Amino acid sequence: MAKKLLVMAGGTGGHVFPAIAVARELQKQGWEIRWLGTKDRMEADLVPKHGIPIEFIQISGLKGKGIGALLKAPFAIFKAVMQARKIIKNYQPDAVLGMGGYVSGPGGIAAKLCGVPVILHEQNAVAGLTNVWLSKIARRVLQAFPTAFPNAEVVGNPVREDLAQLEAPEIRFAERGYPINILVMGGSQGARVINQTVPEVAKQLGNNVFISHQVGKGNLGGVEEIYQATGNGIAAEFIDDMAQAYSWADLVICRSGALTVCEIAAAGLPAIFVPYQHKDRQQYLNATYLADGGAAIIIEQQDFTPQTLLNVLQPLIADRRKLTEMAVKARAKATPTAAQRVAEVIIEQAK
């Protein structure tokens, strides 16, 4: 009979996409996969599109909620644990994988109550609160970066297979001249500071660059017009084929979510990171993984002005060899076997 895995991951692409990569790896080995998520977050649409059945529990975050919600929280968590327990009893998985998001908390507790091994994977350089709690009851804890947990195995972040299959950067970059292709990513929501600053700089860079700018939903206004006027860029709300976009790019300007950092390493690209200003400096610490190795440059959000960006870009645009060096260093930090390693640990720990 096929072994069964229940995947708990939700809320953002940073949790869901790495979990899908692990699910794919286990499906290749004959495992049956089911997902635990919430109806109002992205996994509800995304996971079924990948052919994986999904079950739902009711749970939401408490950050920024009023006192009433905090008082009701224990009851909401208890209810969610009972819902997850019922799903686990019916499905009878051999292991449960927690990849982050609100759903992991009740799901992990329910798995422990049912005697099912819990394996955790932390994608960020700073562990999320749910994973900190669950690490105390998990059979194994894995992490993408060495800073989240003191004694957990570092495996990297599972990324899409097509990125690892891109040619080495020194081969991709060998015959390229000008313009320098700059991929700008504002994220699915769009990062206002990136969307405002980069088009201003495009006006001053002329034909030395061509910019492909992903602005996020509803953010084309103003950006598109600037690129039409400058003639050195295009803007779109979303990019459908990320592997093709990474293959085309010579340089990336973006936020430094954990998945983005690991995708850029897998593709082998130099980057300028503008970390989102989390209280725990999560994105900044993610970015240092590549910046400390000479593969990326970090510009803090408060410093990300047109003039600062221009000062950073001009020497890079003038020196293709430098871009290639940074790209090679980025590829050296990639973890192409992350999904396989997480799958191996699940197989080892399954009951």
UniProtKB/Swiss-Prot annotation:
Function, as annotated: Cell wall formation. Catalyzes the transfer of a GlcNAc subunit on undecaprenyl-pyrophosphoryl-MurNAc-pentapeptide (lipid intermediate I) to form undecaprenyl-pyrophosphoryl-MurNAc-(pentapeptide)GlcNAc (lipid intermediate II).
Gene3D superfamilies in alphabetical order: Glycogen Phosphorylase B
Family (UniProt): Belongs to the glycosyltransferase 28 family. MurG subfamily.
Database matches in CDD domains: GT28_MurG (cd03785)
Record's bilayer topology term: Peripheral membrane protein
Catalyzed reaction equations: di-trans,octa-cis-undecaprenyl diphospho-N-acetyl-alpha-D-muramoyl-L-alanyl-D-glutamyl-meso-2,6-diaminopimeloyl-D-alanyl-D-alanine + UDP-N-acetyl-alpha-D-glucosamine = di-trans,octa-cis-undecaprenyl diphospho-[N-acetyl-alpha-D-glucosaminyl-(1->4)]-N-acetyl-alpha-D-muramoyl-L-alanyl-D-glutamyl-meso-2,6-diaminopimeloyl-D-alanyl-D-alanine + UDP + H(+)
Keywords of this entry: Cell cycle, Cell division, Cell inner membrane, Cell membrane, Cell shape, Cell wall biogenesis/degradation, Glycosyltransferase, Membrane, Peptidoglycan synthesis, Transferase
Broad class of the protein's primary localization: membrane
Pathway: Cell wall biogenesis; peptidoglycan biosynthesis
Molecular function GO terms recorded: UDP-N-acetyl-D-glucosamine:N-acetylmuramoyl-L-alanyl-D-glutamyl-meso-2,6-diaminopimelyl-D-alanyl-D-alanine-diphosphoundecaprenol 4-beta-N-acetylglucosaminlytransferase activity; undecaprenyldiphospho-muramoylpentapeptide beta-N-acetylglucosaminyltransferase activity
This protein's record includes keyword Cell inner membrane: yes
Designated name of the protein: UDP-N-acetylglucosamine--N-acetylmuramyl-(pentapeptide) pyrophosphoryl-undecaprenol N-acetylglucosamine transferase
InterPro entries from the UniProt entry: GlcNAc_MurG, Glyco_trans_28_C, GlycoTrans_28_N
One Gene Ontology cellular component annotation held by this UniProt entry: plasma membrane
Cross-referenced SUPFAM superfamilies: UDP-Glycosyltransferase/glycogen phosphorylase (SSF53756)
